[in-house]
Amino acid sequence: YHSGGNGSLVELDGLINILQDYSLELNFARSQTEEGYLNFLDTTDTFGSHTYQMDGEKFSGRAHNIRLRRVVEGSYSGLRHKDVSPTYRSNVGLVGKNNYKERSYWHGRTFRTDGAFRKITIHASKQNRLNFQDQKTRERLETRLNIETSFNINGVFEFVTKASEKFEGKQFSKQDEIKLAFEYSPSETFMLGFRY
């Protein structure tokens, strides 16, 4: 950089297919950062033992993503562990947030028939997120029902419970969201939709 400082990022990615129905996705990254001395940030805020000011500090960070998925005819499941340390930096801009550890689980089933309801999909997922101080910043449960019919009407019903969410230091209480959508498309050139 013109004002001094430098950064490096090393990442190892992998996708492993296990048997016929499973896949394991792995991403491991490590960053090394040395800040420049052009301090255009007028702040005294800190992250860990470091400042946000451009004052020549050196630090390293890490990021991990491990996801195991199973997909078979009519069913899918998965679990994911992801963490990004507070000092992780990605100069290519692929990581917009750091300082979190997240666990996610999901499962879905699809039923197909030759009747009026051609396809019905039921999906459920759970997400927990903590920061590196082990404070809960998000807990989310989502259920969704998708329906496709033989008379060109499709529908989605989604219910989301955010049991806990923290944003900029403020803890929000439990929030429930309901989404309802219908779509009628009798031809490729006409579609009528409703969302709530």
Which residues are covered by each model-predicted region?
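Exposed, low-structure sequence patches enriched in small/polar residues
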Residues: 7-9, 15-18, 22, 28-196
